[in-house]
Amino acid sequence: MAFCNKLSGILRQGVSQSSNGPVTSMLGSLRYMSSKLFVGGLSWGTDDSSLKQAFTSFGEVTEATVIADRETGRSRGFGFVSFSCEDSANNAIKEMDGKELNGRQIRVNLATERSSAPRSSFGGGGGYGGGGGGGY
């Protein structure tokens, strides 16, 4: 994370010499992503509250969310935990990655931003013969 701090300092120097818009939002994204964790391997019984409780000993948890299937409402087995500072997030990774939570071994690492490729709600995507298919 020292890299992020150094990058932040370099970018701030550039900000003082140019407009704040894009660089400021980029700094915010870097800071946000460096304190947001992906938590995989969650049991079906883990909810937002129990996920947050499992991570509060490492620092102030600003958000804890278990991702659910849109149609069934059932947990998809992963979630995200956000901390107010990146040191807390780093400590949580060190201490919780590979540990057991609600009977399942979990994986904990820094969250990465989703790719910006648009997602189609009409299926598609290949299969035999290529062409994608699906949709209207």
UniProtKB/Swiss-Prot annotation:
Gly residues: bias regions: 122-136
Annotated spans, Glycine-rich (GR) required for cell-to-cell movement: 123-135
Tissue: Abundantly expressed in young plants, root tips, and flowers, but weakly in mature leaves and stems, implying highly expression in actively proliferating organs.
GO biological process: extracellular transport; miRNA transport; mitochondrial RNA modification; regulation of defense response to virus; response to cold; response to osmotic stress; response to salt stress; response to water deprivation
Region (Disordered) residue spans: 113-136
GO cellular component: cytosol; extracellular space; mitochondrion
Keywords noted in UniProt: Mitochondrion, Phosphoprotein, RNA-binding, Secreted, Transit peptide
Reported induction: Up-regulated by cold stress and down-regulated by salt stress and dehydration stress.
Chief subcellular location: mitochondrion
First and last residues of the transit peptide: 1-33
Domains (record comment): The glycine-rich (GR) domain is necessary and sufficient for cell-to-cell movement and to interefere with zucchini yellow mosaic virus (ZYMV) infection.
Subunit structure: Binds to small phloem-mobile single-stranded RNAs (ss-sRNA, e.g. small interfering RNA (siRNA) and microRNA (miRNA)) in the phloeme exudate, including viral-derived sRNA (vsiRNA).
Function description: Possibly has a role in RNA transcription or processing during stress. Binds sequence non-specifically to RNAs and DNAs. Mediates cell-to-cell trafficking of RNA interference (RNAi) signals (small RNAs (sRNA), e.g. small interfering RNA (siRNA) and microRNA (miRNA)) which regulate growth and development, as well as responses to environmental inputs, including pathogen attack; can compromise zucchini yellow mosaic virus (ZYMV) and tobacco rattle virus (TRV) infections at the early stage.
Similarity annotation: Belongs to the GR-RBP family.
UniProt protein name: Glycine-rich RNA-binding protein 4, mitochondrial
Origin species: Arabidopsis thaliana
Gene (UniProt): RBG4
